[in-house]
Amino acid sequence: MVRYAATEIAPAKSARSRGSYLRVSFKNTRETAQAINGWKLQRAQKFLENVLEKKEAVPMRRYAGGTGRAAQGKQFGVSRARWPAKSAEFLLGLLKNAEANADAKGLDTGNLVVKHIQVNQAPKQRRRTYRAHGRINPYMSNPCHIELILTEADEVVQKSEAVVREEAHLSSRQRGARVRRAITAA
């Protein structure tokens, strides 16, 4: 069995998928993966399909040197965004594979969340390009390994009103007044 980077996730309530030595840009795939991390499965799939149709853009945060600006990046609070189609296709394939694995395990596919997604660099593939005056330059590709884990979303439990009132933010002056009242009342 292959080791995943996230080990604390319960295997009974999760489904995994991974791809190794994928010939797709590491930098673009990393940015695309970070965009969908923590999202519900259906929303992540819809987002990647929209990226392929150029209806939504992937925010470029870390590897953004030379990236042009796109208005579609505003929803993520960035100005630099792109539409990495090949990365979106590879991630869509892995999401579909993980969904099928979850279905085979008997998990509720409508309640799945992208809990962990990680993109690592694979060994570079070397080719050559021929330049003027008989020189040769490297023509490298930067493949990657991708792993992702889907888990069933936890049920959201609403706090009681008494707890919410107790947790209300008080300034130091208000806390002091509350303590003085409690002391004089006792």
Curated annotation (Swiss-Prot):
Chief site of localization: cytoplasm
GO annotation (BP), single: cytoplasmic translation
GO cellular-component term (any): cytosolic large ribosomal subunit
SUPFAM superfamilies per record: Ribosomal protein L22
Subcellular location(s) per record: Cytoplasm
InterPro entries reported for this sequence: Ribosomal_uL22 (IPR001063), Ribosomal_uL22_CS (IPR018260), Ribosomal_uL22_euk/arc (IPR005721), Ribosomal_uL22_sf (IPR036394)
GO molecular function list: structural constituent of ribosome
Keywords assigned by UniProt, alphabetized: Cytoplasm, Ribonucleoprotein, Ribosomal protein
Quaternary structure annotation from Swiss-Prot or TrEMBL: Component of the large ribosomal subunit (LSU). Mature N.crassa ribosomes consist of a small (40S) and a large (60S) subunit. The 40S small subunit contains 1 molecule of ribosomal RNA (18S rRNA) and at least 32 different proteins. The large 60S subunit contains 3 rRNA molecules (26S, 5.8S and 5S rRNA) and at least 42 different proteins.
Similarity field: Belongs to the universal ribosomal protein uL22 family.
Functional summary from the UniProt entry: Component of the ribosome, a large ribonucleoprotein complex responsible for the synthesis of proteins in the cell. The small ribosomal subunit (SSU) binds messenger RNAs (mRNAs) and translates the encoded message by selecting cognate aminoacyl-transfer RNA (tRNA) molecules. The large subunit (LSU) contains the ribosomal catalytic site termed the peptidyl transferase center (PTC), which catalyzes the formation of peptide bonds, thereby polymerizing the amino acids delivered by tRNAs into a polypeptide chain.
Protein name as it appears in the record: Large ribosomal subunit protein uL22
Organism: Neurospora crassa (strain ATCC 24698 / 74-OR23-1A / CBS 708.71 / DSM 1257 / FGSC 987)
